[in-house]
Amino acid sequence: RMMGTQATASCGAVIAHHQAPLAAVRRELHAAEQRAKNEGGRDAFSITIIKRSGGALRLTANWGEPVALLNDLRAFLAADGVSRRAAYHTLEWLDAQTLPAPEGDGAMLQSLLAYQLDRQAGGPAKAQAAPLALRLTAQTLNQPAAQRIGWLRNFISVAEFLAREVRTSAAEAP
């Protein structure tokens, strides 16, 4: 029996500290899977990152471009020419309390993102700043208006967390 062309895939993933209680991690995993099914429309992924400090990041998005963008942003943030503080500087001004929710074509958001990413990059990575800003803005505008800034903050934070591991692994390589 085949699943057919209408089959969907939902996936939940949790990244946790090795000393995090396993029962809590399993609960988060179940919650992530449910978010992927409910918030993502039964064809999505949901990543939860449980920080050592006790906080958590949660990102839910559809398959396709958001996955590719997450990987590309992670690679950008891990690149040699990009400041390790790039994500933090971007998150500093990306505040839902002071920044209006992006509307229309999101030109203001795109311009601010491109400027900030470009400022924090050097070498070959600098050329990626504007295209990444364009793609980040497009994905942000796909979110409900009230959740756009929060979703973008989580997206950037998750990419930065994943980039840390790449930077650490590269620094330890002989």
Predicted regions and their residues:
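Charged, helix-rich terminal subdomains or tails
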Residues: 1-174
